Amino acid sequence: CTFKIPSGALLDYSGNPYQGLTLNFKIMEEAITPKLFDVIVDPNGKGDYTNIQDAIDAVPSNRTEPYLIFVANGTYEEFINVPKIKPFIHLIGQDKEKTIIARKLTSASNATGDGGEEAWQYSWRNEANQSQRFQEAVTMIYATDFYAENISFVNTWGTEKLIGPMAEAMYTANDRIAFYNCKFRSFQDTWQTKVQSSSENGINARHYASDCWIEGAVDYFYGNGNVLIENTTLYNVRYGSVITAANHTTGTNWGYVFNNCTVDGINKVDPDKYGTESLDYQPSKGTAQTLGRPWQNNPITVFLNTKLKFDI
């Protein structure tokens, strides 16, 4: 830029005309640093919210681009529900080993089944539990275009009791749902993929997970839809585990595909650790693990380039 004072435009104290001045200089525009996250969740009060669900509730509805929520380290003892009107939510954890969403939840129908009265106490079917009525899993995703990274999703009924009944940590029910570097932990029915004809892309709704850890013992990855799991550890928390229970509808394109994964875990009877009352104590069944079994008549499950660390 040039700043110029013409000759004679200014006078000195004696009335003599000023000879003029020309200044040449550059204007430097400082780049605005883009905001990395839209909001921050921190249990210690150092962010915008102290719990995750409040941050989700505040997200504008029907977005068409990602809304980034940073989740600081901490154990968040809450239920998470991402409704259908909240697409494009991205939950970015600080450290998957230290950023944990964990609650105790079961699907017990009464006080006489697996887990007895205690399982019924934590059941989403129990009318006394209004805070968790119809919350079938600790985390439930109904929206499209959801993404999570560096977070552990845990149902502590499964991880602490190591018995049934169903105790889902994750429930996903729409299209374009993805996870990276996350952990999913329970015992029975850890993660259910439940897409329906009403889901976007219908029965062919798509899920993707990479570099994750999925843990359980009974049907711990089950449901339907098209799901690609890559570079992930499937960890059996007892011997004789069953990993998948597929329930695909006729017309499903690909079903469940596990690529470059590792099947690992416990492969022996350990009553000292699990107790003879748990499902783990079944010596007559031997030590083999089961990659999957059909839940209904049209299961599609494929394992590609997958390492098995014990017999099946």
Positions of the model-derived regions?
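Sequence-level preference for short, compositionally simple segments enriched
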Residues: 30-312
